[in-house]
Structures are given as structure tokens and as C-alpha cells.
């Protein structure tokens, strides 16, 4: 797209579509998809709800001083919180973590 508010566009509709096209696990990267750390957790939750089999994201203990991808990196504490939320969400949408 030509959207400039985020780094890229995370097409959540592609997750269930890909599930019909492949036997392979679908892994979503909300860090690079958005380029903004404050969006990572909500996009990770949306991806799991849409059927993603896994999440990969940038984690850094000091994102402001990361050599690369700092703007999209979450802290270990944020990652821990996100994983707690994902563990609560997963069974609600019929998924396991």
C-alpha cells in the first residue's frame, strides 16, 4: 500500500487465507509489520485471533539505543506482559500457546 503511518501494512486477512493454501505454520511479525512498538501487542493479539500459529517480534532491553529496529522493538517486560495476554486470549479463540 501507500500508507505511511506505519512501516508496512499487516494484512490480517491473509492469515486465514494462507491457512487454506498451505500446511505450513503461519508466523506473523507485528514488529516489522508496523514499525511502531506501541502497536506490537495489539497486532500480535489480532494475529493469534486470526489463526496465526506463532508470533516473532523484536525484543531489546534498551530499544532507544538499539543499533537497528529500535522503533519497533519492545522491552523484555513488555514481551512478558504481551505473552501473558496472548496466553489468556489463545483458548478463547481456540488456539494454544
Sequence positions of predicted segments:
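Catalytic alpha/beta core domains of metabolic enzymes, predominantly
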Residues: 1-59
Amino acid at each position: 500500500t501507500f500508507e505511511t503511518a506505519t512501516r508496512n501494512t499487516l494484512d490480517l486477512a491473509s492469515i486465514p487465507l494462507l491457512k487454506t493454501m498451505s500446511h505450513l505454520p503461519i508466523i506473523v511479525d507485528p514488529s516489522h509489520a508496523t514499525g511502531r512498538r506501541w502497536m506490537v501487542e495489539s497486532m500480535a493479539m489480532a494475529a493469534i485471533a486470526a489463526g496465526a500459529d506463532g508470533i516473532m517480534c523484536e525484543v531489546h532491553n534498551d530499544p532507544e539505543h538499539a543499533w537497528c529496529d529500535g522503533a519497533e522493538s519492545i522491552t523484555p517486560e513488555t514481551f512478558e506482559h504481551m505473552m501473558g495476554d496472548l496466553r489468556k486470549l489463545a483458548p478463547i479463540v481456540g488456539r494454544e500457546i
